Design a protein with these regions (language model features):
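C-terminal amphipathic/interface module of NAD(P)-dependent oxidoreductases
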Residues: 254-288
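N-terminal Rossmann NAD(P)H-binding glycine-rich loop of SDR-like oxidoreductase domains
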Residues: 3-23
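A conserved pocket-lining segment of Rossmann-fold NAD(P)-dependent short-chain dehydrogenase/reductase
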Residues: 168-191, 195
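Glycine/proline-rich active-site loop of Rossmann-fold NAD(P)-dependent oxidoreductases
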Residues: 131, 155-167, 202-213, 219
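Conserved beta-loop-beta element that borders a ligand/cofactor-binding pocket
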Residues: 134-158
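NAD(P)-cofactor binding segment of oxidoreductase domains
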Residues: 58-100
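Conserved Rossmann-fold NAD(P)-dependent oxidoreductase catalytic core, especially the SDR/UDP-sugar
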Residues: 84-126
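Mid/C-terminal beta-alpha module of Rossmann-like enzyme folds, strongest
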Residues: 2, 197-253
Length: 288
């Protein structure tokens, strides 16, 4: 297949592109500028994803699409609505696959109740627009678009993603310190980018229309344990960070990173034969 991947230079998009190419597919990857790096074999396409006409033109020459791009700012919801709307219109009546990157944050706090694809929505403010976008994809099945919604946990791998930034050692008057929001007792549900890329490739190839999959490891990571791994490596101490103070730097993201989540990817493993095999988050952090 010839597959359009939005955000091909990003953490998720580049992993999806590598997985698709590794399975024999051709990838057209959107980038924001010609000098943005993309995986070997990707056909880069400079495109303004806020422009529906550009998306319609890009979709005309492909057999499937995967949307992973994000503006990572206050326009993220607008971008998703634009991309999803344009690609649904372009693919209507064709049966072509369109995989959308949602997220596990959509489900909010789980506590000790294991989140599945059927768990209710309770998103933090930063992704409060996502239920409406997911509804567009759900409804598009009736228009003969093979939509697939993938909800990844917190993505890591190769030193990329939010985790290395969040837990990066800082210096104060007493030396190096690794800070986590509040007491760090909450759990992150996580997934390596390369494992996630394989999930997307499998889903694009064979997932039924309207499918939803959680893309995460079944064992969550306690945030303070992750912080301790980084601290030990850098001879630093671990410190609680008052969420109110942290909001000066991380704004609405603090609420999301404070979520306590446990989840299962049993559905993806059973239906698609997905088998995550990359190092876990703690192993990754110890190696950085």
């Amino acid at each position: 297949m010839r597959v359009l991947v939005t955000g091909a230079s990003g953490t998720i998009g580049s992993a999806v592109a590598r997985a698709l190419i590794g399975r024999g597919h051709t990838v057209v990857g959107t980038v924001t500028a010609a000098d943005r790096p993309v995986p070997a074999g990707v056909e880069p396409l400079v495109a303004d994803l806020f422009d529906p006409a550009a998306l319609t033109a890009a979709a005309a020459s492909v057999d499937a699409a995967v949307h992973t791009a994000s503006s990572n700012d206050e326009r993220a919801g607008e971008l998703d609505h634009t991309v999803v709307g344009a690609l649904i219109e372009a693919f209507a009546g064709t049966g072509k696959a369109f995989a959308y990157t949602s997220g596990l944050w959509l489900h909010g706090n789980s506590g000790d109740t294991v989140t599945t694809e059927e768990s209710p929505f309770d998103p933090p403010l930063v992704v409060s627009w996502r239920p409406a976008v997911e509804k567009l994809l759900e409804d598009a099945v009736a228009r003969e678009v093979r939509t697939i919604r993938i909800r990844p946990g917190l993505v890591y791998g190769g030193g990329r993603g939010y985790v290395p930034m969040l837990l990066s050692p800082q210096n104060d008057d007493d030396g190096a310190v690794v800070r986590h929001f509040a007491d760090g007792s909450n759990r992150w549900s996580v997934i390596h980018a390369d494992d996630l890329g394989e999930l997307y490739a499998l889903a694009v190839e064979s997932a039924p229309a309207g499918s939803v999959y959680l893309g995460t490891l079944d064992e969550s990571v306690r945030v303070k344990a992750a912080a301790q791994v980084v601290a030990d490596k850098h001879d630093a101490r671990v410190q609680d960070w008052d969420p109110t103070d942290a909001q000066q730097y991380w704004s609405v993201m603090v609420e999301a990173f404070l979520l306590d989540q446990v989840a299962t990817s049993a559905k993806a493993r059973k239906e698609l034969g997905w088998t995550p095999s990359q190092p876990g988050l703690l192993e990754e952090l110890a190696a950085l």
